[in-house]
């Protein structure tokens, strides 16, 4: 295994620091310790939808349904069964033996209350539009509800399964300031949070019973969770080496591989639905006319080699693979048959010569700090090897959005987290909505995306998505580069479940166990 000198020095230095801490394995205390980059004052993803809040909320709260990624099927969580009465109506039979973490019983009133609160005109939520497809939610019995959508959509279950956590009417309803709820959360989830502190972190304990356990959300096995806010990778690594935490997320590839060489640590790659991708300005909104020639775009695709991107981001020995399609294979509605261009520098040069650009041309790659910058730096060298003189423009998120809106992106290396849905719908909205992201100039792409997001017949929907993604690939517009996987360095005592991920982190807390 190759490790850079810098990474080696970092690990050696941190190992020396770790020696000053007493190793303190927590398996014997049935306590799993990990860190988060953000300070969390309110554990409620409705109020604060940051990824780390959503991840920890998964342990506290439940959705009506979940998604079994391995089988590609929806399964009940708070619902024990459901039926589609007609294309616009879903009816759910709810579990009758579920309790809230304060001991009160869960019932249909809680479901109706949650969605009525979310949809109320005075409720201000960042992602409220994700639920405006609902027309109404009705109580049909003590443990039966009906959800009616405004129009027939094939992804309603996907939205209901994805961080759509149900709230307790008795605890949430009376609060004038709804942020107070997340400071002392009450949920039906597998863990009960006994501490939510912005400075010291989160503490949760396993619920005594979890009768709604399913393949999408199994019953917990670890007794106690301790989550500490730590903002920098160096401190996280030091705590890991000192035995003060059991899991560390997304330590840089070289460093993670070297840490995993220690006998007390292991390395695990957990895939997620997102991707880092390359987008080309097909219609020269940026004024870069050379990019309108499909031979030039194909040359760019042939010049890039994704293997070094995988290595630099995830390190060696991780077996990370380039995505085979624009969508993840476990997404409902994902379909693509057109293959991506393979790496071939000689072919890239021939294509440029055929396009009258044998002497090459200049192009700008827009990227942001982090993974995007890492990939862009390697990509620029690959393009230069084919005769394309690429320079890198590093953007903040704000400047990137300005450039996107103003038509100033030539090549874009960026990331997309998958939208949090086990369905292709959000991906279609992200890439093919009629907004400033349009650098393709193909009205039929908008039409195909809209039709796919309204088509109720599964096979017809797959055909629409396949047609769209195949055309996108043929015109060399967008191509995925690496998966949005998560690298975990963890104690040898920690075990992740096998199979596909349940969320953007690659696991939920109830899916972790001791070896």
Predicted features along the sequence, with ranges:
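Long beta-strand-rich cores associated with HINT superfamily self-processing modules
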Residues: 488-515
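Surface-exposed binding/hinge segments that line
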Residues: 21, 26-27, 83, 128-171, ...
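Acidic-aromatic pocket-rim loops
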Residues: 48, 278-279, 324, 399-454, ...
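Gly/Pro-rich hinge or "lid" segments in bacterial periplasmic/extracellular proteins
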Residues: 68-73, 161-220, 224-226, 234, ...
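Structural transition elements
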Residues: 191-192, 287, 320-354, 372-374
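Extracytoplasmic/peripheral linker and loop segments enriched in polar/acidic and small residues
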Residues: 389-400, 426-492, 515
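N-terminal lobe/hinge region of extracytoplasmic solute-binding protein
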Residues: 35-86, 116, 186
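Alpha-helical secondary-structure segments
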Residues: 33, 107-114, 142-148, 189-190, ...
